[in-house]
């Protein structure tokens, strides 16, 4: 009976198992297909769009209002103006209606205006005359002879104007216009010269482009949730089907994960230390501002360019940053994902990847050190900020690990999880194709697994979960956007660029060899060590079919992943060097593999090992043949950040090249000896022990990077450095804003001149100034810049201001002064003349010097011309003499010169720029009681002029104190992470804030990087500020680092007295393919 009972129990168990298998098959197939379909239709499902309309006049009054559109142009605009309004204007005329201030930069080129002058009424749009009518024809009101109203429309169909009631010679209504969609005007508000109550019939209505301001409908939310739930169900069912192989359950995390070694401690400590003191990545400020503004706007806009279009379909990672901003915007917190990804990459490398490559790798200590140190050396210059390369590197590594697990165990669940990981990795950025390369590298064995498994359970239960896993990312990418909006955003980015063709991939490597930050020592090593190890591994594995202790399949899949990624990168639309951060993790694995391949156990002949050592020394030569540059503020105090590293005048590149030549010649010598020659102790030490070439080189570079940052902190202390700012942030520090000092009023702080008989220039000119005049400055001398024509975006008001004052200043000068200096209080003396040249000398009056204190650390002289001085960037620059002489009380009650100071002069190579010469009080004796300016221009070359103003002791406040955290600021894309406490100009419902200030990087970066990137022609924010505001550069200094150009603070003044417009908001349900038309991106 017991036998029968057991057989019965077995039969029941078999039937139950069979039934469970059938259920799992059906669940995997049906849930997978439902998840796939639900994900695919998500982009097409409807959303609720927030609509916004600008209607004017508002509150029944003819007031100008502001409403700067982040898309710059509206969907459409209509305007109706009663002709009685024209008749009511004074004889001189005025602006009836405009979409920008008339005095804004290039206002006529960008905006729509209805202008009235003494003779005509003009409707102009973007410098095109739509219609012009004699003013005497536009007389009377509705019902009276003549014009009754002016009607203007601007849509995708074109821009047209009609003077209702006025006919042409043929008796037809007088109408004009052009069917050009690019004539739609830019709107920063509605501006008028009219005053008083709004007359009946006067109206303007503009539909604001809010296509990206949307939320999912209930239907779409249901579809997304259904896609996620069914995908999870399909994966669980697939896992159940995998259990049919009869193998016992394996631990998800193997026991080896709990074992920690000295390598683990060193690598993790390196990551933690670098997180605190290390350099940041190039676009941190960019991503920071996108994240900080996303919550207010309701979507992740590409804030600085491309007309406020979203990052989708790539960039879901930035939404994580936006969530983190709710906790804190401190650098060490917001950069935490990169730290976590770095540590996770090492744990995966040491516990999953290296064991898969074979016992020869995981059991060889130099290989472990090579992996850890190469990971650190490649991670440090690229992946310590907010750029997504670190997350992509982790995604690619996880994909590779899952593929290897799938191949090892012959199961499909890891394949599905690898597909899911690859999909989300590519959803971060197009360079996430590195994960797809990993999938393709393992494609053949995975296909074999699929074919083998489908014989037992069928095809659809295996394929459907894969389809669902690969497409569920669409529910994240299109959660709030539609297919139509994402396609439009993609078109905008492609049309404006950068969007480079595949055959320009050489640019990426060209940038790497330039002596710039992109081609700096650290960035070169991170890529070149990976490339050297990769091609070495390829050559050796091709030559040696079987290598003891090395798993050939995983090794080739690792190599194939990197080679495939290099191929895929050629199709990426941008060619930036920072994309090489993708290779940090997989490159470390290849480094470990190569360390074994070039060891004595594999390369028996010392010639080959020495040849590899020579190649590595040549890589080091290339790495040191550039600057030790780091991005923006990360370079502060770093040795050789603008020059090739050297010792006693000899560059390290030269030293490494000599070593390379010696080793290469020795390898050449070994080529002609027998294979056993050259196996001495030194050679074995260099190629076999811990001092093996790869870990030694990577360790050396890691120490160089860390040492550079530590040196920067020590040399900068107590002023700004990356590491010191991160530490201060723990107690509420505000980054660079705590160390940048601002003069709230540059007219304050001028000292009293001691009485004497001075010449015609007053105390500034002293008793007998020679060659200096009150107007000795050439026209178009502007503050902290070289004026160029045509003006580029982001320039200050003084670029376009009159070149002469309407009334002479205090000493008869008509030269406009910078920094808001009042010519009625501040005199000027300069040597510029177009006539006969002469040697010029000036010794000013003695000015009474107040006692030094913390609020007054400087004596400042505002000057222009080619002046001898010192700066961090340029070192000592030569020119004419402008020095500050300080004096002590003399024996007869007079003053005795006690010494002279050469100025810190940031703009020594920009002779036609007004700037502030800085003289530190700390360099003067405490008992100095007076100072005076001594200037000499002994050159007879007309370009060697100089101009000076009296010295002042300004009262300084930190930028954080002056600007605060509540006023809207245009933070240029480079500076955002360094100024975490300043409030960025926000945008919502298609309209932006109006900033009070602009913070820029240093002069060169502003001119080359931010001014051009944020240009209004590219859909950038400068298209708003240039048209609406007037910028003035303020006097600023970096505390205790007076010779450094940290950047600039510019104050915005409105061109017109206005108040923000009130928008009419509503909602509308839009399908996934609905579009209001194309965004106007052409000039």
Curated annotation (Swiss-Prot):
EC number annotated for this UniProt entry: 2.4.2.-
Compartments where found: Cell membrane
Family listed: Belongs to the emb family.
Protein name: Probable arabinosyltransferase B
InterPro entries registered for this protein in UniProt: Arabino_trans_C (IPR032731), Arabino_trans_C_2 (IPR042486), Arabino_trans_central (IPR007680), Arabino_trans_N (IPR040920), EmbABC_dom1 (IPR027451)
Biological classification of the source: Bacteria, Bacillati, Actinomycetota, Actinomycetes, Mycobacteriales
Biological-process GO terms, alphabetical: Actinobacterium-type cell wall biogenesis; cell wall organization
Transmembrane annotation, as ranges: 23-45, 222-239, 252-274, 331-350, 357-379, 421-443, 456-478, 525-542, 555-572, 576-598, 611-633, 648-670, 690-712
GO terms under cellular component: plasma membrane
Membrane topology, record value: Multi-pass membrane protein
GO molecular function: arabinosyltransferase activity
Described purpose of this protein according to its UniProt entry: Arabinosyl transferase responsible for the polymerization of arabinose into the arabinan of arabinogalactan.
Gene: embB
Superkingdom, natural source: Bacteria
Top-level class of the enzyme under EC nomenclature: transferase
Keywords for the protein's UniProt record, in alphabetical order: Cell membrane, Cell wall biogenesis/degradation, Glycosyltransferase, Membrane, Transferase, Transmembrane, Transmembrane helix
Pfam families recorded: Arabino_trans_C, Arabino_trans_N, Arabinose_trans
